[in-house]
């Protein structure tokens, strides 16, 4: 039932004021044993996952980031009582002794948030936060970028990947959560009349890499101000 509730409503019941969320997270992390190993995010359905807490790491940097992602998830993910009932009906059909009786009592109580049972806590010692699955996957990269931002030195982070792999989503999150500017390669298309005849067979053959280098990478690497001139594909102008 807890899994059903979490996959339906996400971390809504754990969200609140950012300061409270952060204090609770820091307190929980500080109590974890140092040898508690990191685990990959655990998908729980409906676009959500459990991000497990580890016993080591720089939580003074990671905890605020995780708190922000939790609050973003709570604001963006919305479930309904009907969605929860669909999950409970599926659970009721499982051949588990006592499930039907337990769910009957749970429904009469109004289906409140569910806590892990003592037996589950003893067996698994759960410590995690529920995030959107994408946010759980992005977290290591976001944390690495946060470390660069904290260094106080100019830094350039390149995000590469296949079409539709989440590059823009990660970049947007960095822009929302970190003190940085995001430059999209979509703004640096090469005008069609300047492309090679076989540009489709050339990696980045449709990109104006020379302009991107001179207007963005060189000044950004030197800590200087960049001049962003997006290319408008419709008008063919900058």
Task: Explain the meaning of each model-derived region.
Residues 1-120:
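Long, basic/Gly/Ser/Thr-rich N-terminal segments
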Residues 124-150:
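N-terminal pre-Walker A segment at the start of P-loop NTPase domains
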Residues 156-158:
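Short hydrophobic/aromatic beta-strand immediately N-terminal to the Walker A/P-loop
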Residues 162:
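P-loop (Walker A) phosphate-binding loop of NTP-binding proteins
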Residues 167:
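Conserved lysine of the Walker
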Residues 181-238:
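Conserved nucleotide-sensing/catalytic segment adjacent to the nucleotide-binding pocket
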